[in-house]
Swiss-Prot record:
Organism of derivation: Chlamydia trachomatis serovar A (strain ATCC VR-571B / DSM 19440 / HAR-13)
Gene behind this protein: coaE
The name this protein goes by in its record: Dephospho-CoA kinase
UniProt EC number: 2.7.1.24
Catalytic activity: 3'-dephospho-CoA + ATP = ADP + CoA + H(+)
Binding site for ATP: 14-19
Record flagged with keyword Ribonucleoprotein: no
Pathway(s) it belongs to: Cofactor biosynthesis; coenzyme A biosynthesis; CoA from (R)-pantothenate: step 5/5
Matching InterPro entries: Depp_CoAkinase, P-loop_NTPase
């Protein structure tokens, strides 16, 4: 039996990664989100949660959970704190994804294994995957999407983008680049074409 292809979808903030993954999932792929996995670790009274509390302080505990908003306010704009938080979370996220992949392989029911990893290249994790799909979009378009979706500020967008490596560098390294500067329908069509091409390599 051929191994189940491991595909990562990555890209800058508000580029369209989640939308692409939704299309892949609708077409039958198994999809997992690194962000959602990391959020699942944001609970107190666990070893990971306690390490995060030790790093950022007990004030991040709100209503018996670790507040993502409180965490974001502390780490965005403070690179040292952000990197320290990532050093706690990313190994756990990668371990979880690899365990999930092993489980999905055994199920033998999905054509592709897709993992949405925003900071794939930044944490040096691309080599684990068979192929990397980069979703790209112009900065102005991404900012407009971010502001509309989150109600955040230009500053909050810029702070989030600061952690990401250059788009040009990622384009050179990615196996597939899907541009998302047009309509949602145009983008979804491109992703569907990508899915068909990937299935053809199995």
């Amino acid at each position: 039996m051929l191994d189940l292809l491991k595909i990562s979808v990555t890209g800058d903030p508000s580029s369209g990664k989640t939308e692409a993954c939704q299309v892949f999932e609708d077409l039958g792929a198994y999809v997992i989100s690194a962000d959602k996995v990391s959020h699942s670790f944001l609970v107190p009274y666990t070893s990971v949660g306690q390490r995060i509390i030790d790093l950022l302080g007990p004030e991040i505990i709100i209503e018996n959970t670790l507040s993502r908003k409180a965490i974001a306010e502390k780490v965005f704009g403070n690179r040292d704190l952000l990197l320290s938080l990532e050093e706690i979370l990313h190994p756990e996220v990668c371990r979880f994804v690899e365990e999930k992949y092993a489980h999905v392989v055994q199920e033998q029911k999905y054509p592709l294994f897709i993992a949405e990893f925003p900071l794939l290249y930044e944490i040096q994790y691309a080599d684990w995957f068979d192929q990397v799909i980069l979703i790209s979009a112009d900065t102005g378009i991404r900012k407009e999407r971010f502001l509309k979706k989150t109600g955040g500020s230009d500053t909050s967008f810029d702070l989030r983008c600061a952690r990401f490596s250059s788009l040009e560098e990622k384009i050179l390294r990615a196996d597939v680049v899907i541009e998302n500067n047009g309509t949602k329908e145009e983008f979804r069509c491109k992703v569907k074409q990508c899915f068909k091409a990937l299935k053809g390599t199995i």
